[in-house]
Amino acid sequence: MAERTLVTSALPYANGPLHIGHAVEYVQTDIYVRFLRSCGRDVVYFCADDTHGTPIELNAAKQGLKPEEFIARFHEEHQRDFHDLDVRFDYFHSTNSPENRQYAELIYGRLKEKGDIERRNIEQTYCENDRRFLPDRFIKGTCPNCKASDQYGDACEKCGKAYDPTDLIDARCALCGTPPVRKHSEHLFFKLSRHEDFLQDVLRKPGFIHPGLATQLQGFFEKGLSDWDISRDGPYFGFAIPGETDKYFYVWLDAPIGYIATTEKWAKETGKAKSALDYWSADADTRIIHFIGKDIVYFHALFWPAVLNVAGFHIPSEIKVHGHLMLNGEKMSKTRGTMVPVRDYLDQLDPSYLRYFYAANLGPGVEDLDLNLKDFRQRVNGELVNNVGNLANRALSLLAGPLEKRLAPGRAEGPGRELVEAALARVPEVRDAFDKLEYRSAIRVITEIASAANGFLQTAAPWAQVKKDAEVARADLSDAADVAYLLGALLAPVTPRLSEKLFAQLGAEPLTFQALEGAKYPLLDRSRPIGTPEPLLPRLEEERVNAIIKLPEGAAAPQAAEARPAKGAKTEKKPAEAPAATQAAAPSAGAAESPGEIEYDDFAKVVLKAGKVLAAEKVQKADKLLKLTVDVGEGSPRTIVSGIAEAFAPEALTGRNVVVVANLKPRKLKGIESRGMLLTAGPGGKELSLLDPGDVAPGSEVK
């Protein structure tokens, strides 16, 4: 039997809405699963709400709800958000389910049979008023490290230090405010320390986890692995431990078992497997891949494999770990209004924008990802809207108009055929990049393919050719449509709804990576008419992007990261502030001297034209310069050297609409003749915006 792949994302906690930081992981995983399916692989994708534990019990009580009612509300909300974000699980379940209880009890029983469960007396905080032990979140007090007040019993939200509930200063019960007492209780521990050799072998397996994380995990072995407390005293929202009185499984025992329970539920409902054991038995021919954030590596790489191994289950084959999401270079924060719920994003913007931006910045490492809102807008507009979208719109609009939606047969030779064949030759690069989670590399190749096709159209100029020889124009546009079809297939894992629109406009069946194996020119069935073209995605406007952040009253709007001086650059000391009256009268320090008024005739000499950037590259030995190839409607594009390299990556400019000073005398910069200038606005350096004339034809005069 061929190997099957089972993929999971970490379980979202049913204690609140999903935010765009959570979305990084689910989008990353969904892209991978869609890619595997496109390649014809046998893959299933599971997730569930993590529903047990103290925070849920506490917050449900605050809202006057039973925990079951509380988690049901967020379960429905999470499912809706995932669907609208285009994340498609084979099954999304809950850890508060009969299947999860079944497997939690089964696994616990096997751990107990193997002698891996030990009873120990531990000291805990206890509220005599409420007659209950107080887990971390049921106790508050002063942080023993930074002395911040009103902190929970597990970690300080101000300094970030972790501690035991018994370490809190002036501790009190979070429910009633009564100072707790200390009391002994018998708890159950999983003997993780017995499995160090096994876990060392697991960490040494190639591909199991990122090498840097494997090295980091060695620190736990140097200190000696600690046995794991898997029980909590009642009352507690979770599963009662069989054979025990008033003891419950700690959430970190039953939460990962939710992966197995979800497989079981899916098997029951679909009949596609006899049970979860078809995938999870120790001898199953299954590749199990967990996608997680870097904050839960310990549980998934050490505790979880040890538990599975003792219980006779299949251990994870690979653990894919990602970093956290930053917003404009800073940690997201509720108090600053930057902890953006997924729903707030979806109320404003298409999910394709966010999925594309995440993919364009994700690799297989664990570095944090920065959602800089300015960069987000520029990259999406430059690469997705103006490059990929523009190619499809240019080709299909002409085909649908004067050429009556009919494609030309494939050509025996010529630049159009060479364009398509060159694009097909790059498919293995994209496939390999997706397979290795090098999404940003895949996106780079995809945008290069689109740029080449736009350049081909610019040279062929079918909008002019159609008046001279309609069949030549039809052939050129059909070859460009072939590339658009290919781009739809390559982008389908990332932006599925955009690809669906593109396939429909082409009048073609969805194209997959599997179908591309051995594919030859022409890709499209040239005997079929195309559909009705329309813009695939509107441009991202600054107002809509900023609207995803709902600021608390009195909070300042978050800004993109300030430009910093280059390393070794000199900076002037800020002069002492002058009296207010003097400041008002004098020009700002460093301001350019005004040239004064000019005559209209002087201004009329300047010719401003709309242009479109076809290609962009860095100028060697010039950190601030970019060499741009710009179409200004003259038959052949111009080369313009522009000092905007600090503000824009070359790949973010391809496809951008720009305003060009078209009648400047050519001049050489770094040995390159520059024939024009782009209009920008801003203080300079990294803080520049390109003036955009809108969706007008290259060469249109700007008045």
From Swiss-Prot:
The gene is metG. Its cofactor is Zn(2+). The lineage of its organism: Bacteria, Pseudomonadati, Myxococcota, Myxococcia, Myxococcales. A motif ('KMSKS' region) lies at residues 331-335. Residues 602-703 form the tRNA-binding domain. This is Methionine--tRNA ligase. GO terms for biological process: methionyl-tRNA aminoacylation. Keywords: Aminoacyl-tRNA synthetase, ATP-binding, Cytoplasm, Ligase, Metal-binding, Nucleotide-binding, Protein biosynthesis, RNA-binding, tRNA-binding, Zinc. It catalyses: tRNA(Met) + L-methionine + ATP = L-methionyl-tRNA(Met) + AMP + diphosphate. NCBIfam families: metG (TIGR00398), metG_C_term (TIGR00399), PRK00133.1 (NF001100). Homodimer. PANTHER family: METHIONINE--TRNA LIGASE, METHIONINE--TRNA LIGASE, CYTOPLASMIC. It comes from Myxococcus xanthus (strain DK1622). It is an enzyme of class 6 (ligase). It is found in: Cytoplasm. Residues 556-568, 577-594 have a biased composition (Low complexity). Binds 1 zinc ion per subunit. InterPro entries: aa-tRNA-synth_I_CS, Anticodon_Met, Met-tRNA-synth_bsu_C, Met-tRNA_ligase_1, Met-tRNA_synth, Methionyl/Leucyl_tRNA_Synth, MetRS_core, MetRS_Zn. Is required not only for elongation of protein synthesis but also for the initiation of all mRNA translation through initiator tRNA(fMet) aminoacylation. Its EC number is 6.1.1.10. Residues 556-594, 682-703 are annotated as: Disordered. One of its GO terms (cellular component) is cytosol. ATP binds at residue 334. Belongs to the class-I aminoacyl-tRNA synthetase family. MetG type 1 subfamily. A motif ('HIGH' region) lies at residues 12-22. Signal peptide: none annotated. One of its GO terms (molecular function) is methionine-tRNA ligase activity.
